[in-house]
Each structure stands twice: as structure tokens, then as C-alpha cells.
């Protein structure tokens, strides 16, 4: 697959030397495909790799001291469990949730790298999902399930496009890693991990998300509005077989990631 030219970066946040060296990738996949397990493996694999996790704790309003990405702002502390609210009353909370989810992803992709990463010779940032999957997978699916109405969907697309155009040079990605698993396997893993907010998720919803991931990242037939996204390199990893406790499978996945990085 042809690789597009390295993006132009004009961010005042980081020095030009770092921006020329760093590679930014998102880890995409269905709910419970294995992303959290995968990014933990990545984080341990190299001192030059940094993982920016999905801010689940923020969405659940859970205060934690384990990771600064999971801390809450003052305005959130009495905001309730937005993820639970989404699953309990999707038609009421879908637009609110997707608006906040996208905002939190923009913040994550603009976050200042760690000092260790700034000094790395070959720095890599991995983001657990991205502003693109927020729109083309999750918000789109909620609209198709009629949990987001036409007016909300039009507004979401309008500000999402404007937002990304404003920050394009700072949040653009070099590539995407798609963790591919069947909806049935994702359902099994969802039940195994036992996240309370997710217990009402139906297989039909996972099938819808799977179809969208396939269209976007596997078949590459999905229509997208951002030119950089149309030609972005994608590596597909089959994670239908469990790899959480299998060191051989983990090493095989890491080898593929290293090959992909070398091609960018």
C-alpha cells in the first residue's frame, strides 16, 4: 500500500525535531476486541513507545490516581456516569456522550508527550481509538439506530469537521492498526471482562460496529470526508484467537507492528 507523505506539523506545543521524528497511530476495533490488552503489550514493548488510553474513567466519572489521563475536571465531578446513562437511555444521552467522547479524544491527541518520549530517537504514540472512529463508527451507528436524530447528526458532523480542520496538523495520524475480531468473539470477551455499564449491549450492536469497521478499515469502501484518511496506511491484525496470556502470539503481533512502523 502506498504511504502518503509525512504530514506537515505546525504545533507550537512540541519542538520541530520531535514532530519530525514522532509517529502517531490509532488502535481501532470493536468493543471488547482486545484493544486494552493490546495497548498494555505495546506499552511494555519499548521505552520509545507511549500509549494514550481511551478515557473510560472520565466517561464513567470514576476518580482515579493511577493515570493522569483518567483524572476528572472540576466540572465533571458531579456529572454522573455518562457511559451508563448512554446505555440506559440512548435516545436521551447519545448525542451528549458522543460530543464529550470526541472532545476527550481531541484532548488526548493534543496531549503533551512524556519527557521520556520527547527524548526518544524513534518516538511512537499509540492512541486507543481516534476522533475518526468516534464519528465514522460510533456516532454514525447511534444515528442509524435512531438514538441520534437528524438534527443532532447534522450538528455533530458540522462541528466535527470544523474541529478537525482547525487541529488537523496536530491530530493527524501516520497509520491505523485495526484489531479484527468477530462480533461473537467480542461478545464473549465483553462478558468475561464484566464492565458493568456494558452488560446490556446486544450482539446486534456489535455486528453493526463490526460492519462499519470492516467497511472503513478492511474493505476500504467507506466514504470519508477527510482526504488524509482516504489514503492512510492500515494494518489489520486478526485477534480472534486469545493472546492475553500467550507470549508467542504477543511476540508475533509485536513483530508485525514493528514491520508496519518501519514502512511508515
UniProtKB/Swiss-Prot annotation:
<feature type="binding site">
    <location>
        <position position="98"/>
    </location>
    <ligand>
        <name>substrate</name>
    </ligand>
</feature>
<keyword id="KW-0539">Nucleus</keyword>
<keyword id="KW-0547">Nucleotide-binding</keyword>
<comment type="subunit">
    <text>Homodimer.</text>
</comment>
<dbReference type="InterPro" id="IPR027417">
    <property type="entry name" value="P-loop_NTPase"/>
</dbReference>
<dbReference type="GO" id="GO:0019136">
    <property type="term" value="F:deoxynucleoside kinase activity"/>
</dbReference>
<dbReference type="InterPro" id="IPR002624">
    <property type="entry name" value="DCK/DGK"/>
</dbReference>
<dbReference type="GO" id="GO:0004138">
    <property type="term" value="F:deoxyguanosine kinase activity"/>
</dbReference>
<feature type="binding site">
    <location>
        <begin position="189"/>
        <end position="193"/>
    </location>
    <ligand>
        <name>ATP</name>
    </ligand>
</feature>
<feature type="binding site">
    <location>
        <position position="134"/>
    </location>
    <ligand>
        <name>substrate</name>
    </ligand>
</feature>
<keyword id="KW-0418">Kinase</keyword>
<comment type="similarity">
    <text>Belongs to the DCK/DGK family.</text>
</comment>
<feature type="binding site">
    <location>
        <begin position="29"/>
        <end position="37"/>
    </location>
    <ligand>
        <name>ATP</name>
    </ligand>
</feature>
<dbReference type="GO" id="GO:0005524">
    <property type="term" value="F:ATP binding"/>
</dbReference>
<feature type="binding site">
    <location>
        <position position="54"/>
    </location>
    <ligand>
        <name>substrate</name>
    </ligand>
</feature>
<dbReference type="Pfam" id="PF01712">
    <property type="entry name" value="dNK"/>
</dbReference>
<dbReference type="InterPro" id="IPR050566">
    <property type="entry name" value="Deoxyribonucleoside_kinase"/>
</dbReference>
<feature type="binding site">
    <location>
        <position position="198"/>
    </location>
    <ligand>
        <name>substrate</name>
    </ligand>
</feature>
<keyword id="KW-0808">Transferase</keyword>
<dbReference type="GO" id="GO:0005739">
    <property type="term" value="C:mitochondrion"/>
</dbReference>
<dbReference type="GO" id="GO:0005737">
    <property type="term" value="C:cytoplasm"/>
</dbReference>
<protein>
    <recommendedName>
        <fullName>Deoxycytidine kinase 2</fullName>
        <ecNumber>2.7.1.74</ecNumber>
        <ecNumber>2.7.1.76</ecNumber>
        <ecNumber>2.7.1.113</ecNumber>
    </recommendedName>
</protein>
<feature type="binding site">
    <location>
        <position position="129"/>
    </location>
    <ligand>
        <name>substrate</name>
    </ligand>
</feature>
<dbReference type="InterPro" id="IPR031314">
    <property type="entry name" value="DNK_dom"/>
</dbReference>
<feature type="active site" description="Proton acceptor">
    <location>
        <position position="128"/>
    </location>
</feature>
<dbReference type="GO" id="GO:0004137">
    <property type="term" value="F:deoxycytidine kinase activity"/>
</dbReference>
<keyword id="KW-0067">ATP-binding</keyword>
<dbReference type="GO" id="GO:0004136">
    <property type="term" value="F:deoxyadenosine kinase activity"/>
</dbReference>
<feature type="binding site">
    <location>
        <begin position="241"/>
        <end position="243"/>
    </location>
    <ligand>
        <name>ATP</name>
    </ligand>
</feature>
<dbReference type="GO" id="GO:0005634">
    <property type="term" value="C:nucleus"/>
</dbReference>
<feature type="binding site">
    <location>
        <position position="87"/>
    </location>
    <ligand>
        <name>substrate</name>
    </ligand>
</feature>
<comment type="function">
    <text>Phosphorylates the deoxyribonucleosides deoxyadenosine, deoxycytidine and deoxyguanosine with highest activity against deoxyguanosine followed by deadenosine and then deoxycytidine. Shows only very minor activity against deoxyuridine and deoxythymidine.</text>
</comment>
<dbReference type="GO" id="GO:0009157">
    <property type="term" value="P:deoxyribonucleoside monophosphate biosynthetic process"/>
</dbReference>
